[in-house]
UniProtKB/Swiss-Prot annotation:
Belongs to the polypeptide deformylase family. This is Peptide deformylase. It comes from the Bacteria. Binds 1 Fe(2+) ion. Signal peptide: none annotated. It comes from Chlorobium phaeobacteroides (strain DSM 266 / SMG 266 / 2430). The keyword Metal-binding applies. GO terms for biological process: co-translational protein modification; translation. It catalyses: N-terminal N-formyl-L-methionyl-[peptide] + H2O = N-terminal L-methionyl-[peptide] + formate.
Length: 188
């Protein structure tokens, strides 16, 4: 089921998400819906708060990018960053901020402890695009958006676009949720 994406100015995007204690059918259904919604919106990552669910769950699928065509989708539950290495800047966008792009400096390599789609504990080292997308999505679980990590002078350049989003003046090729509207997908 394709879920609407919550956009900038929705409280759920600024809240710290709660850890999951386990996986049940509702969570498995939510994961499937998140993957479907992300792909429908031509995204490569989606965190549960972006579909109105304040839980520590995210999905990533880089296979739409030629370089990562053989990669399988990744489900990450209750992530905890253990170590970071190196830094680089790269332009980022976000399904919750349609049409807005900005340069963000992030660690280029990370070590992450998390639970997978079977709730098995894992520790992995990630670099490049996967490290960047993981950090971007983990930020959503912590109530942060990529625009919070932009340099102030660059952030000021997009104030007009952010204001337009905040008042609901937005267009996207995928369903968007109105601020403050609870998602049925979260009723677990």
């Amino acid at each position: 089921m394709i879920l609407p994406i919550n956009i900038y100015n929705d409280e759920v995007l600024r809240a710290t998400a709660k850890p999951l204690k386990g996986i049940d059918r509702n969570i498995r259904d939510l994961v499937a819906s998140m993957l479907e919604s992300m792909r429908n919106a031509s995204g490569i990552g989606l965190a549960a708060p972006q579909v109105g669910c304040s839980i520590r769950l995210l999905v990533i699928d880089l296979s739409c990018m030629e370089k990562y065509a053989d990669e399988k989708p990744v489900v990450v539950i209750n992530p905890h960053l253990l170590a970071v290495k190196g830094y680089n800047a790269m332009e980022e966008g976000c399904l919750s901020l349609p049409g807005i792009l900005g340069d963000v400096v992030r660690p280029s390599s990370i070590t992450l402890k998390y639970r997978d789609e079977h709730f098995e504990e894992r520790t992995g080292e990630f670099s490049g695009m996967m490290a960047r997308v993981l950090q971007h999505e983990i930020d959503h679980l912590d109530g942060k958006l990529f625009i919070d990590r932009m340099q102030k002078r660059d952030r000021r350049k997009i104030d007009k676009e952010l204001h337009s989003l905040a008042i609901g003046n937005v267009e996207a090729d995928y369903p968007l949720a109105l601020a403050g509207i609870a998602q049925k997908a979260c009723e677990a």
